[in-house]
Structure formats: C-alpha cells, structure tokens
Design a protein with these regions (language model features):
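Short, flexible, solvent-exposed loop/turn segments with mixed acidic/basic and small polar residues
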Residues: 1-3, 34-40, 153
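Intrinsically disordered, low-complexity polar/charged tails and linkers
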Residues: 1-6, 18
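Small-residue-enriched alpha-helical segments and adjacent helix-cap loops
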Residues: 9-142
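Mobile "lid/hinge" segments at catalytic clefts and subdomain interfaces of large enzymes
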Residues: 118, 123, 127, 132-177
Length: 177
C-alpha cells in the first residue's frame, strides 16, 4: 500500500527481461485502469503506482492472462535477479548474465527467507548489474564466475565478500541456490 492509500503492482520480469507482448499488456492495464504512474524500478521491473484497491483483482486478472505474475516487490523473500546484457550483447561480456539470471530467479522464486533477498548477475568484472552490493552476486570472469555474498546498497552500503570461483553456470546455481 502506498502513502495515499493506493497500491503498487509489479509484475515479475525474469532476470529483468520482457517481451513486446508483455509491455503491451502492461500499457493496456495502465490505460484501462487509469494508473497515474508507470516507473522502471532499480530491480529492472515495471511498477504500476496508484492502483485503486477495488481495481486490484481485475488488474491482476488482465496481467495474468498475458502471462505475467507477481514480482513480490514488497515481500520478504526473493525480490529480483538483476542482470546486465552479458556476453549476448556487450563487447566486454565474458558470460551469459541474462541466461544465468533467469535460471537463478526461476529456481529461487517462491523461496521463503526471513528478510528480502536481492541478487544480481554481471557478465564481466565491469559489474553493470551491481552484483557487489547485493545479498548474492555473481560476476562473470574469463574462466567462469566469482560468487559474492552479503552486500548491501541501502542506508549502510557494504561491498560483498568473495566466496570463491566456479567454472560453469551449473556450479554457480549449485553454490547460491
């Protein structure tokens, strides 16, 4: 619930990725329900702000019909897996950050945790997904991935601790999931 008594609706976008059809569905919902603010979040999602309580069931029904599910933006648990474009699109990318991020988010979605958990996968040491200030961060390097833990980007910024190095996507998933 927002400070004016309206609600925020944040559909999940696995690894920060979306499609033209999903974007059209979000735009259609914003138009149909006269949602006053549509904002891209720091977690690479789209937040529909100012949704009236009585519209929530219909908003979610329309989004669900388009294949969109809740991003659990305010839940205690897995928030998002932020990704950079990685080796698919970036000239510096050494690893497939988007692919690994989507796998990781799907694997962990619905997990219960005592507090919010933010994750990121960067495709190279340039760290465009800000993996070193997340609870769990994975950074692509030439020989695989570095696994990082215990970062924070809130009031008390803290860089992660390096846990170690793994060679493959599967090993990265095994170590963090």
């Amino acid at each position: 619930i927002q400070k004016d008594g309206t609600y925020s609706v944040v559909p999940r976008m696995w690894g920060g990725l979306t499609t033209p059809d999903e974007l059209r569905a979000i735009a259609d919902v914003a138009d149909r329900f006269r949602i006053p603010t549509v904002k891209v979040t720091g977690g690479q999602r789209i937040d529909l702000l100012g949704v009236k309580k009585e519209d929530l069931p219909a908003v979610w029904a329309q989004l669900n019909a388009a294949g969109l599910v809740s991003g659990f933006a305010y839940a205690k648990g897995l928030r998002t897996v932020k990704t950079c474009v990685g080796s698919d699109w970036c000239r510096f990318g050494t690893q497939d950050a988007m692919g690994l991020g989507v796998k990781l988010e799907r694997l962990l979605c619905g997990s219960w945790t005592p507090a919010k958990v933010k994750l990121a996968v960067s495709g190279c040491p340039r760290n465009c997904a800000e993996a070193t200030v997340k609870d769990v961060g994975i950074i692509g390097v030439d020989s695989g991935y570095e696994i990082h833990f215990a970062g924070a980007a809130g009031l008390h910024v803290r860089a992660t601790d390096l846990l170690g190095h793994v060679d493959t996507d599967e090993a990265a998933l095994e170590h963090v999931a």
